[in-house]
Amino acid sequence: MSRIANCFAELAGKKALIPFITAGDPHPGLTVSLMHGLVDGGADIIELGVPFSDPMADGPVIQRASERALKHKVGLRHVLEMVAEFRRDNATTPVVLMGYLNPLCAMGYTEFASRAKAAGVDGVLTVDCPPEEAAELESALDAHGLDTVFLVAPTTPPSRVAEIAKLARGYVYYVSLKGVTGAGHLDIEDVARKIAALRQQLPLPIGVGFGIRDAATAKAIAAAADAVVVGSRLVQEIEAATPETAREQLTRLVAELKAAIR
């Protein structure tokens, strides 16, 4: 059983909290400490963003985080080194890399999958790789025991959901809003209806992200979803903090979110 599958099994119906931060933001030396801070606050799974120069699915907050990381020359190899360092003290919390296809292509899917597995990565979510084009990547990841996590949007047709159901492992990430990360306001009832429909096609846990900025919204989403994903709000916290206070502030915010979804 993968670490992700084991995480959901151990939750036994309780809801998972999946925080997102960008590797290398605000600087590379702080990322591993922040990851441990997320766990201290109650994170069940960590989504770790791979910095990219053209993060088209991300709003201004996460775009700025990528820019800060890229100023420090943080690339995919550095991100894998950070995961390996995190694993020296944490062998249980699943880590999912979230990013774009180009850096994986540049490394080569098989080489990437091998290095990711060795580092202690558990899953990979590429926001710009549709299921129709994912077979080669999914095959490389699966051969190394890594889960392929897919996005499902409000506009995803049932035919594409069916394709995702064949390839996805670990969990599925439902994008609760049209547009970029950190934007808009959620229609909780609509999200609940969409998740109920998706459950007819998807056998995996469903996490919901985009637009979850506070404990009240997290609690409302958790009533319908298996996991709550929070990214922009946490990255915003990092942006506003000093390097000395960032971990403590993240831990506090994650603890508030975790308490809300229990």
UniProtKB/Swiss-Prot annotation:
Catalysis: reaction(s): (1S,2R)-1-C-(indol-3-yl)glycerol 3-phosphate + L-serine = D-glyceraldehyde 3-phosphate + L-tryptophan + H2O
Enzyme Commission number, as recorded: 4.2.1.20
Any GO MF annotation of the entry: tryptophan synthase activity
InterPro entries: Aldolase_TIM, RibuloseP-bd_barrel, Trp_synthase_alpha_AS, Trp_synthase_suA
Family affiliation: Belongs to the TrpA family.
Subunit structure: Tetramer of two alpha and two beta chains.
Name of the protein in its database record: Tryptophan synthase alpha chain
Taxonomic classification: Bacteria, Pseudomonadati, Pseudomonadota, Betaproteobacteria, Neisseriales
